[in-house]
Swiss-Prot record:
CDD domains: Ribosomal_L11. The keyword tRNA-binding does not apply. This is Large ribosomal subunit protein uL11. Forms part of the ribosomal stalk which helps the ribosome interact with GTP-bound translation factors. Coiled coil: none annotated. One of its GO terms (biological process) is translation. The lineage of its organism: Bacteria, Pseudomonadati, Pseudomonadota, Alphaproteobacteria, Rhodobacterales.
């Protein structure tokens, strides 16, 4: 018989750097899930990604307090900022887009880079083909203040 699903939880954790401190520990602890088991499994599954890449993960937890993980691709904004070569700034040391998108340009990417990002994100996007996925990524680029050349 299949396990009974109690619920699911969405978190964004840096690849290979999950630890029991907030936000992971409290989110799992209040649901009675084994935090260290999650940390070990997540770090093992995200080992092939570049360390520190923000990785969305969906945790489905069951009645017997077991869980399953589903890793998603990094956010489009992160991939765009990385492709545009934006330098990390601020106290969290993350790349930052334009403070005034549409008026100020933070960086630029090519159509080929947009296509590459769209192909990588294809399984997580609600798009039927790469062209539709590219339009979604173009919208994200515009929101970040990144111009597209070519």
């Amino acid at each position: 018989m299949a396990k009974k699903i109690i619920g699911s939880l969405k978190l964004q954790v840096k690849a290979g750097q999950a630890n029991p401190s907030p936000p992971v520990g409290p989110a799992l602890g209040q649901r009675g899930l084994n935090i260290m088991a999650f940390v070990k499994e997540f770090n093992a599954k995200s080992a092939d990604l570049e360390p520190g890449t923000p990785t969305p993960v969906i945790i489905t937890y069951y009645q017997d307090k077991s869980f399953s993980l589903e890793l998603k691709t990094p956010p489009a904004s992160f991939m765009l900022k990385k492709a545009a070569g934006l330098a990390p700034v601020g106290k969290r040391n993350r790349p930052k887009g334009s403070t005034k998108p549409g008026r100020e340009v933070a960086g630029s990417v090519t159509v080929a880079q947009i296509r590459k990002i769209a192909e990588a994100k294809m399984k997580d996007l609600n798009a039927n083909d790469v062209e539709a996925a590219m339009q979604i990524i173009l919208g994200s680029a515009k929101s970040c203040g990144i111009e597209v050349k070519g």
